[in-house]
Swiss-Prot record:
Fe cation 1 binds at residues 114, 119, 151, 155, 295. The keyword Membrane applies. A motif (Histidine box-1) lies at residues 114-119. Expected to bind 2 Fe(2+) ions per subunit. This is Stearoyl-CoA desaturase 4. Substrate binds at residues 69, 142, 149-150, 182-183, 256. It is found in: Endoplasmic reticulum membrane; Microsome membrane.
Length: 353
């Protein structure tokens, strides 16, 4: 059953307030609730949860290991561990570069691939889109198109075999294991049927996809390795192991915590029937992505949180871009909707309960 929501548009702050609640199923024996697909983003619907999909019965398929990825991740983390031993002897500019690079790259994931392109929770003008596509390339976590396709599948088929990093398969699988094995057949089957027409029509996203390997070589490998070496005389060993291996391993693991820890540990104040949790530690590590129970309850909210800037650097960044006129039409769930949802499906942990 669908419902068209009245929208309250504020031209002053360029924010769309969602005025009616959104319902979804309850799990673990609780009553299932009808889904209402709000017509607030006409260009995208395939990130809304589909309660009709259920896993097929029977034994899971045999795991097929991707040894290339296993070897790469093993070598990366060995290099990162060695990089930790080099941190005390590296120049201060080197680790400052690593922090700066990861914040920018992180925004390419959180403000770019996630909130802009996966969920269309706000709109960005060309200069901001160019910045975010470059920042996303710096992160080296798949191109925007592939990242968004996997993420939409994660929301639509959450915690089923069609979810690429299904948390029901355990912490390790949802953290990194899903990258070390072939995708479950259900992920492939459902993923190819997702509507990705909005991204296929965006020239910048498809340009990145076409030249992704070349761009990653330049922006992810060459720049962070050679800049410390050439500009302030860092040793090549320190540049490679600290500014590249260690930096990248930290960025990856902080991102992966959203898939693992934020689906297994924390409170569920907005929807007790789903696995996604509120995890402040994950929010600190991931620039604000740890308010996961809220995000899976209201995936169309640009802040992915009820509290906007609280432990949420990405929302602060988007709001700054809006103040500069580079971001607009930010979707925000109204307080009345949030409180109604807390009362109806929350676990009682919210301060208003």
């Amino acid at each position: 059953m669908t419902a068209h929501l009245p929208q309250e548009i504020s031209s002053r702050c360029s924010t769309t307030n969602i005025m009616e609640p959104h319902s979804r199923r309850q799990q673990d024996g609780e009553e299932k609730m009808p889904l209402q697909a709000e017509d607030i983003r006409p260009e995208i619907k395939d990130d809304l949860y589909d309660p009709s999909y259920q896993d097929e019965e029977g034994p899971p398929p045999k795991l097929e290991y991707v040894w290339r990825n296993i070897i790469f991740m093993a070598l990366l983390h060995v290099g990162a561990l060695y990089g930790i031993t080099l941190v005390p002897s590296c120049k201060v500019y080197t680790w400052l570069l690593g922090v700066f690079y990861n914040v920018v790259a992180g925004l390419g994931i959180t403000a770019g691939a996630h909130r802009l392109w996966s969920h269309r929770t706000y709109k960005a003008r060309l200069p901001l889109r160019i910045f975010l596509i470059m920042a996303n390339t710096m992160a080296f976590q798949n191109d925007v198109y592939e990242w968004a396709r996997d993420h939409r599948a994660h929301h639509k088929f959450s915690e089923t075999h069609a979810d690429p990093h299904n948390s029901r398969r355990g912490f390790f699988f949802s953290h990194v294991g899903w990258l070390l094995v072939r995708k479950h057949p259900a992920v492939k089957e459902k993923g190819k049927n997702l509507d990705m027409s909005d991204l296929k029509a965006e020239k910048l996203v498809m340009f990145q996809r076409r030249y992704y390997k070349l761009a990653v070589t330049l922006m992810f490998i060459i720049l962070p390795t050679l800049v410390p070496w050439y500009l302030w005389g860092e040793t090549f060993q320190h540049s490679l192991c600290v500014s590249n291996f260690l930096r990248y391993a930290v960025l990856l693991n902080f991102t992966w915590l959203v898939n693992s820890a934020a689906h297994l540990y924390g409170y569920r104040p907005y929807d007790r029937g789903i696995g996604a949790r509120e995890n402040p530690f994950v929010s600190m590590a991931s620039l604000g992505e740890g308010f996961h129970n809220y995000h899976h309850t209201f995936p169309y909210d640009y802040s992915v949180s009820e509290y906007r800037w609280h432990i949420n650097f990405t929302t602060f960044f988007i709001d700054c871009m809006a103040a500069l006129g580079l971001a607009y039409d930010r979707k925000k769930v109204s307080k009345a909707v949030v409180l109604a949802r807390i009362k109806r499906t929350g676990d009682g942990s919210h301060k208003s309960s």
